[in-house]
Amino acid sequence: GLLEFNKMIKFETRKNAIPFYAFYGCYCGWGGRRRPKDA
């Protein structure tokens, strides 16, 4: 889910990813189960 994704990004970037990715793309939650478009 989005929280797990945020934890992964925090580990990689050492910053909070939710403010950016919240509008960047829906990974899970709002629109159900979707794949990231960039990956």
Curated annotation (Swiss-Prot):
Top-level taxonomic group: Eukaryota
UniProt keyword terms in alphabetical order: Calcium, Metal-binding, Secreted
Protein residues bound to Ca(2+): Y27, G29, G31
GO cellular component, one term: extracellular region
Tissue: Expressed by the skin glands.
Pfam families: Phospholip_A2_1
Species name: Rhinella diptycha
Biological process according to GO: arachidonate secretion; lipid catabolic process; phospholipid metabolic process
Any one GO MF annotation of this record: phospholipase A2 activity
Name of the protein: Phospholipase A2 CS24a
Subcellular location(s) of the protein: Secreted
Keyword Secreted: yes
Lineage per the UniProt record: Eukaryota, Metazoa, Chordata, Craniata, Vertebrata
Function: PLA2 catalyzes the calcium-dependent hydrolysis of the 2-acyl groups in 3-sn-phosphoglycerides.
Gene3D superfamilies in UniProt: Phospholipase A2 domain
Family: Belongs to the phospholipase A2 family.
